[in-house]
Amino acid sequence: MYNIELELRAKYPNLNIKGIIGSVRDKKKLEDVFSKYKPYLVFHAAAHKHVPLMEVSPLEAIKNNVLGTQNVADCADKFGTKRFILISTDKAVNPTNIMGASKRMCEMVIQAKNKTSKTEYAAVRFGNVLGSNGSVVPLFKKQIKEGGPVTVTHKDITRFFMTIPEAVGLVLQAMTYAKGGEVFVLDMGEPVKIYDLAVSLIKLSGLQPDIDIPIEITGLRPGEKLYEELLMSEEGLEHTKHNKIFVAEPLDIPAEEVNKRVEMLREFVQTENHTMEEIKKVVKKAVPTFVEAEEKNKKIINYKQELEKIEARQMQEHELMPKEA
């Protein structure tokens, strides 16, 4: 907050900026702020976003991400906000971790709220934002600078990437296009192999992979899946005026059902002494598309191995075919 405020004041000295410290979990504080300033637009970006940390502290993901989003969405409705944009993630699609499941629940919260409010609620799904805090590129650069190793969790792991200008553009375009209930998705091109990204960054530094800088495969972390997705199978895509921004057609979940799931989670997090198995069971009730990473990754690896066998067999058959004279 301190650095953001300094930067904004330096760039826009005539802009009226109010920096306010608070938590989305503190509804009374939120109501005081909304009551005083009556925001016309709300961009809701507050969230715990790191997958491994939320696997260790799953109840915090529910409290901050889900219940915090409900609090802000309620205040936007109560105090007459015109438009509310939720920052979501591709990890919300068929989630394999608590963080992704919590963000999918956030999408459901704002879509349910949109059905009963004059405020227009929409969401944008981000991929990995290049150069942002906690992203893989600054980490790799730091590891290269320190002489390695560069750590990659799996040789086949891929991710969708977007630049900071693309991310900002997606949010602003979503704000102008939103009519209420949409989930906006950016065409980010083909997913990038993280291993290939590590190799490229080492070479761009004038060094040789596995000669000057070793690449270490560390193993998938809890909740981490090999491939991210932009859409659930039930969602379709609609075009917008922008040729790289699309709208995922919303799934029709009754608002009453979503509210019931939120209250179930709210009641569940009142006590802390839950096992991980109990937590995942409740999260699966709230987010039926949640599948544990180990199960998802096993299916992907098996499918890939089957494809490789088929390709090898086809090549062998091709080699055995009689050559034309």
PLM features: what roles do these ranges have?
Residues 8, 36, 58-60, 100-105, ...:
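Short secondary-structure boundary/capping segments
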Residues 19, 61, 84, 121-124, ...:
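Hydrophobic/aromatic anchor residues within beta-strands of the central parallel beta-sheet
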Residues 20-21, 63, 154, 217:
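Conserved residues in the N-terminal Rossmann fold of short-chain dehydrogenase/reductase
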Residues 25, 92, 129-131:
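Conserved sequence/active-site signature of Rossmann-fold short-chain dehydrogenase/reductase
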Residues 34-43, 51, 81:
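Proline-aspartate-enriched helix->loop->beta-strand connector
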